[in-house]
C-alpha cells in the first residue's frame, strides 16, 4: 500500500495538467495509512472532546475503529451522522450556526480534505487567502497593501449567508469537472446532505456546507475559485493603458527644470550659477508636491482584487461609474453561475480616502505631501497614494468590553475608559490569571501588529489590560492595587512565581511593547502547511501498534484515552501522573484499564 506522501504528491503532480480527470479516488480511502495521518493531524484539537450527535468523542480511539470505518467505506454503507448544531457569537452581536460533526465523520472528512487539497491547491488563484497552506488574514492584508496602491475606489464584497447558501448541485458539477469518480462524488454529497440536530430535532440540509465541518473550507474555496477566475479574466479586459499620462503640473515643472539645466551648462559666472541652482531646488520642491501621473486619466484603468473565504474587496483605479459597474457585473455572475446573492446594502462602493473595512482592519489610501529624499537624493513624497491598514478605536473598545475588562463612564459628554476587575478569574490561581491576560494581549497584538497605527492605537489597550489585571488580583486577595504592585512588582516588572520540577520559576506580565511589525508571508497561517506527518517512535499510531498498555504493561489491542486539557488533571491517579509527566493529552491503554479510568477504579 502506497504511503500517504506518495499518494498526495502523485495527485498534486497530475493536477498540474488542467485537462486531467481524476478517477479511482475513492480507493484512497481504503488506505489505513491515510487515516493514521488524518488522526495525527486533528487529534490535538480541543473540540474533539466535544460529543457529536452520536454521543462519542475522540476518546477510545483504536486501530480497530479505523478498520471498521474503512470497511463501511468499502461496501458504501458508511453514512455521515447529522452534526450537532451550536451557535457562536458574531462581531455584530448576532450568532453564527456551527456544526459539530462526530469524530468518525471528522476523521473521514480530513482524509477527503487532504485529497481535495492535493488536487485543487495548485490551481487556486494567488488572490485567494482563506484556509490555504501558508496563507492567512495577514497575507491577504499584505497583498492589499502592496497591490492596491493608487486605487481611487473600493468595492467591499458581501455575499449573503454564503456558507448556508452554497448550491449543492452547482458544487457537485464543479467537482465533476476534475473528478470522474462516482463513489467519491457520492461521498461528498453524503456529507452535504447529512443534516443537523438542534434541540433534539433533525433538520435536512438542502444547501450550504456545515460550518464546523473539516471539508467546508476547501469546498468553499473550490466553489469561489470560479469567482476568482472570473475576476482574473474580467481584470484583463478592464485594465487599460500601460502607464498614466504625465500630469500638467509635472510636465510644467519638468520643462522648467530642463530650461535651467541647459542654462547651467553654458553659464560660467558663479553668482548666476548659484542663483540657477537655487531656482532648480525650488522647482524640485514644487514638483514633489504634485503626483507624477494624471490622477483622472481616462485612458488608464486598473483593477485589483483579494478574497479571504467569503469576504472580498476590489480596488479600482478609474471612475466611480467603473466601480459601480464592477459591483453589478460581480453580482450578476454570482447569481447566474453560482446561485449566490450579493448584498446590495452591504456591498459598498467607497472612495479610498474614506474607510473600507476588511478582516477587522480599516483600509484607506493615504494622500500626503510629506517629502523625503530617495537613494539618488531626489525629493519624493512619503505617501503618494499608498494603502494604510489601521485598527480603529471602536475595535479596541469592543474587544476590551467583550473581555469584561473595560468600564465606560461619561464625564462632561466625553466617554471615559476605566479598567475593570475580571471577576470570572478571581478564583483562579495567580499563574492562570497572568497567563489569561498575556494570551489575550499577545493574541490581539499579533493580529493587529501590521496596522500602520498599531503602536498608537494600542496605548489605551495596554493600559486597560494592565490595570484590569491589577484589579483582578486585588479582587482575589481583597486588597488595594497598590498592595498588589508592591507584592508582585520587581525591577519594574510584574512577576508571578510558580513551582516546577526544576524549582521556582518566574513568569512576567507582557511588556514587549506594541511596535508595528513588518508584514511578511511567513505570518501565522490559518491551516497547516501541506506536508505529511512522518510518524516517529512516539507517534499516536506507533503507540497503538505497540500493543503494550502504557499503564499495566499488558499485551493486547489498545485504545487511546484523551483528555481535554492537561492542566485539568490533578495528578491524584496513576494515569494522570503518567500523562502529566510525559506532557501528553493521550495515553494508550488496554480496554480493561480504559474502563477502570472512566469508572474511577484505577489503582
Give, region by region, the residue ranges found by the protein language model.
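Non-catalytic terminal/accessory segments
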Residues: 1-603
Amino acid at each position: 500500500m502506497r504511503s500517504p506522501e506518495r499518494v498526495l504528491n502523485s495527485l498534486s503532480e497530475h493536477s498540474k495538467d488542467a485537462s486531467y480527470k481524476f478517477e479511482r479516488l475513492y480507493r484512497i480511502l481504503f488506505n489505513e495509512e491515510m487515516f493514521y495521518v488524518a488522526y495525527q493531524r486533528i487529534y490535538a484539537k480541543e473540540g474533539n472532546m466535544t460529543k457529536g450527535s452520536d454521543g462519542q468523542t475522540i476518546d477510545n480511539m483504536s486501530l480497530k475503529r479505523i478498520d471498521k470505518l474503512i470497511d463501511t467505506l468499502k461496501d458504501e454503507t458508511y453514512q455521515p451522522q447529522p452534526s450537532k448544531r451550536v451557535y457562536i457569537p458574531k462581531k455584530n452581536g448576532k450568532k453564527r450556526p456551527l456544526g459539530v460533526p462526530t469524530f468518525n465523520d471528522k476523521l473521514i472528512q480530513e482524509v477527503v480534505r487532504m485529497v481535495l487539497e492535493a488536487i485543487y491547491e495548485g490551481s487556486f488563484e494567488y488572490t485567494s487567502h482563506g484556509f490555504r497552506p501558508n496563507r492567512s488574514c495577514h497575507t491577504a492584508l499584505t497583498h492589499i497593501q502592496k497591490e492596491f496602491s493608487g486605487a481611487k475606489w473600493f468595492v467591499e464584497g458581501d455575499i449573503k449567508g454564503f456558507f448556508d447558501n452554497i448550491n449543492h448541485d452547482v458544487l457537485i458539477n464543479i467537482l465533476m469537472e476534475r473528478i470522474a469518480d462516482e463513489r467519491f462524488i457520492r461521498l461528498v454529497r453524503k456529507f452535504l446532505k447529512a443534516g443537523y440536530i438542534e434541540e433534539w430535532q433533525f433538520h435536512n440540509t438542502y444547501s450550504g456546507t456545515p460550518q464546523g465541518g473539516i471539508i467546508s473550507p476547501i469546498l468553499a474555496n473550490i466553489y469561489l475559485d470560479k469567482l476568482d477566475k472570473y475576476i482574473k479574466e474580467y481584470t484583463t479586459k478592464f485594465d487599460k493603458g500601460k502607464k498614466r499620462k504625465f500630469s500638467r503640473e509635472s510636465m510644467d515643472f519638468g520643462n522648467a527644470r530642463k530650461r535651467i539645466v541647459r542654462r547651467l551648462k553654458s553659464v560660467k559666472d558663479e553668482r548666476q550659477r548659484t542663483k540657477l541652482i537655487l531656482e532648480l531646488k525650488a522647482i524640485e520642491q514644487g514638483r514633489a508636491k504634485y503626483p507624477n501621473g494624471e490622477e483622472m486619466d481616462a485612458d488608464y484603468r486598473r483593477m485589483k482584487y483579494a478574497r479571504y473565504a467569503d469576504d472580498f474587496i476590489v480596488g479600482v483605479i478609474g471612475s466611480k461609474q467603473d466601480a459601480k459597474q464592477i459591483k453589478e457585473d460581480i453580482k450578476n455572475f454570482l447569481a447566474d453561475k453560482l446561485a449566490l446573492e450579493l448584498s446590495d446594502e452591504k456591498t459598498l462602493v467607497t472612495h479610498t480616502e474614506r474607510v473600507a473595512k476588511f478582516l477587522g482592519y480599516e483600509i484607506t489610501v493615504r494622500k500626503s505631501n510629506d517629502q523625503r529624499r530617495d537613494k539618488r537624493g531626489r525629493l519624493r513624497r512619503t505617501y503618494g497614494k499608498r494603502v494604510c491598514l489601521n485598527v480603529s478605536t471602536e475595535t479596541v473598545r469592543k474587544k476590551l468590553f467583550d473581555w469584561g475588562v473595560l468600564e465606560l463612564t461619561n464625564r462632561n459628554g466625553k466617554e471615559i475608559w476605566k479598567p475593570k476587575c475580571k471577576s470570572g478569574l478571581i478564583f483562579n490561581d495567580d499563574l492562570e490569571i497572568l497567563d489569561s491576560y498575556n494570551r489575550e494581549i499577545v493574541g490581539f497584538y499579533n493580529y493587529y501588529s501590521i496596522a500602520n497605527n498599531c503602536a498608537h492605537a494600542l496605548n489605551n489597550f495596554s493600559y486597560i489590560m494592565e490595570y484590569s489585571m491589577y484589579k483582578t488580583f486585588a479582587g482575589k486577595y481583597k486588597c488595594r492595587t497598590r498592595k498588589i504592585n508592591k507584592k508582585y512588582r520587581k525591577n519594574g516588572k510584574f512577576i508571578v512565581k510558580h513551582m516546577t520540577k526544576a524549582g521556582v520559576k518566574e513568569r512576567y506580565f507582557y511588556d514587549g511593547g506594541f511596535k508595528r511589525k513588518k508584514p511578511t508571508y511567513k505570518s501565522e497561517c490559518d491551516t497547516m502547511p501541506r506536508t505529511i506527518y512522518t510518524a516517529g517512535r512516539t507517534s499516536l499510531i506507533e503507540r497503538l501498534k505497540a500493543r503494550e498498555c502504557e499503564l499495566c504493561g499488558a499485551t493486547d489491542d489498545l485504545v487511546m484515552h484523551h483528555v481535554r486539557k492537561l492542566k485539568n488533571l490533578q495528578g491524584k491517579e496513576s494515569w494522570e501522573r503518567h500523562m502529566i509527566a510525559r506532557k501528553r493529552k493521550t495515553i494508550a491503554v488496554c480496554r480493561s484499564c480504559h474502563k477502570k479510568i472512566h469508572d474511577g477504579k484505577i489503582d
